[in-house]
Regions:
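N-terminal secretory signal peptides that target proteins for export/translocation
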Residues: 1-18
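Intrinsically disordered, low-complexity, compositionally biased regions/tails
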Residues: 6-10, 138, 283-286, 304
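Composition-driven recognition of long, C-terminal low-complexity regions enriched in serine/threonine
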Residues: 12-13, 29-32, 212
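Divalent cation-coordinating acidic motifs and surrounding scaffolds
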Residues: 19-22, 38-251, 258-259, 329-338, ...
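Hydrophobic membrane-insertion alpha-helices, especially the h-region
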Residues: 25-37
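A post-motif C-terminal structural segment
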Residues: 234-333
Length: 418
């Protein structure tokens, strides 16, 4: 780990202290943008947002940037993470590879359609949690709001406790809104380092209930696979009809920088400027979007590129707070809330307002296409660089889950794009 190869060395990105205040200030400044128009520009994307009093003419809507999702083409994933005192390495790897893991799903298509991605997050084994709840907490239900998942993940702190795997699997099985459709991919990934059989809830019972709902439970041991604990985690995977992995939680995540990362970062900044908050929580959620960019970038520019790739996909939707996504989902809501928008928008006539939305939407799609092109080039560069490197495969959380996802999606009839 950490060897240099040619002009593009691999880098081990250390964890940095993260302060949100500067980013919240940036979010506030972004939210005060009052006039958004399109002007031709060089560099990232075909468009650049600028302040001007003119209204750009509406352009013909471009073709969709990616395959559309359907309700019958869904992937649901719950991550159950041990946050007892010995699990700092596990949580660090989860933070470092969240966007890389989600990016694997973006490569999947079935019948030419991209899947909808829903993610849930639990943590367990933490002494700050209530013992009557089994030291377990649901941090997020199944949701398409991946920024919320990232926010909860980056807030996790470890603290010693008792780890009850059967209990947390049972809670995830019972509490989450799992799709009843057999075509939906339903996966649980549980990671920890103590015996899988601890606690009052028998693991075999919880796993049986999950299997009854078509949920596949995969187990990830952070430790020696050849000891007694390894046997219990293997047995858990067998009963859960899933896969067993073991990882070295202390192994540092290795990033391969690329010549495309800087351009991707610039595109991402411009993409953010196409988001206009709407509703009572709009400004706060816009600030969270920027905060999660900062969290991703705290692990390096290459990691931000992985997040930008997801943000450029059809799975990144923010209808709850973004003007454009809200208009796509419910135009009547936008009209009702129009007067709460900045004067540069609220004072426009209906025709001018629709022109503005169309222009802004075209700018976003242009930037998304640009990011997709750049990240595809980046992926090819990284893969070629990795093939040139010698050594063993990565034994980290992200690498194991990514490989597992590819295998499972192929089994369910998905095609994985290169």
């Amino acid at each position: 780990v950490g060897r240099n190869f040619g002009s593009s060395p691999t880098k081990i990105i250390p964890v940095k202290n993260r302060s949100s205040f500067a980013w919240l200030l940036a979010a506030t400044l972004t939210a005060t943008l009052t006039i958004l128009t399109l002007t031709q520009a060089k560099g990232c994307g075909n468009y650049l947002l600028a302040s001007t009093s003119s209204i750009a003419p509406a352009a013909a809507a471009p073709a969709p940037i990616a395959a559309e999702t359907t309700a019958n083409n869904r992937i649901q994933i719950a991550f159950l993470l041990d946050t007892s005192s010995s699990m700092d390495g596990l949580i660090d790897q989860a933070k470092a590879r969240l966007w890389n893991i989600l990016g694997e799903i973006l490569k999947a298509e079935k019948n030419g359609e991209a899947p909808t991605i829903e993610v849930a997050l639990y943590h367990y084994g933490n002494t700050t949690l209530l013992p009557q709840n089994g030291y377990i907490q649901q941090l997020s239900p199944l949701t398409t709001d991946v920024d919320a998942i990232s926010e909860k993940l980056f807030a996790l702190k470890t603290s010693g406790g008792d780890e009850y795997c059967g209990h947390v699997v049972l809670k995830a099985t019972d509490e989450l809104e799992w799709d009843a459709d057999d075509n939906t991919v339903k996966l649980v990934y549980i990671a920890g380092n103590e015996s899988f059989d601890q606690g009052e809830v028998p693991a075999i019972d919880a796993l049986g209930k999950a299997a009854g709902k078509g949920i596949i439970v995969n187990t990830i041991l952070c430790g020696n696979p050849n000891g007694a604990d390894g046997n219990s985690w293997r047995a858990g995977a067998r009963a859960g009809k899933g896969e067993f992995f073991y990882i070295n939680q202390d192994e540092k995540v290795v990033y391969i920088p690329s010549p495309f990362d800087e351009a991707i970062e610039k595109c991402n900044l411009r993409l953010n400027k196409t988001y206009i908050p709407i509703g009572s929580r709009g400004a706060a959620l816009q600030a969270n979007q920027i905060a999660q960019d900062a969290n991703a970038q705290s692990y390096g520019q290459a990691n931000l590129s992985s997040r930008a790739k997801f943000k450029a996909s059809s799975n990144y939707r923010n209808a709850g707070w973004d003007l454009l996504d809200a208009n796509d989902e419910d135009p009547s809501r936008v009209l009702k809330e129009k007067m709460s928008l900045p004067d540069s928008l609220s004072q426009l006539s209906e025709v001018e307002f629709q022109q503005k939305l169309t222009s802004l939407k075209n700018a976003r799609r242009s930037l998304q296409r640009e990011i997709q092109t750049l990240t595809n080039q980046r992926d090819k560069f990284v893969e070629q660089t990795r093939r040139k490197q010698s050594g063993t495969a990565s034994n980290t959380l992200g690498a194991k889950i990514s490989q597992s996802l590819r295998n499972r999606l192929v089994q369910k009839g998905y095609r994985i794009k290169k």
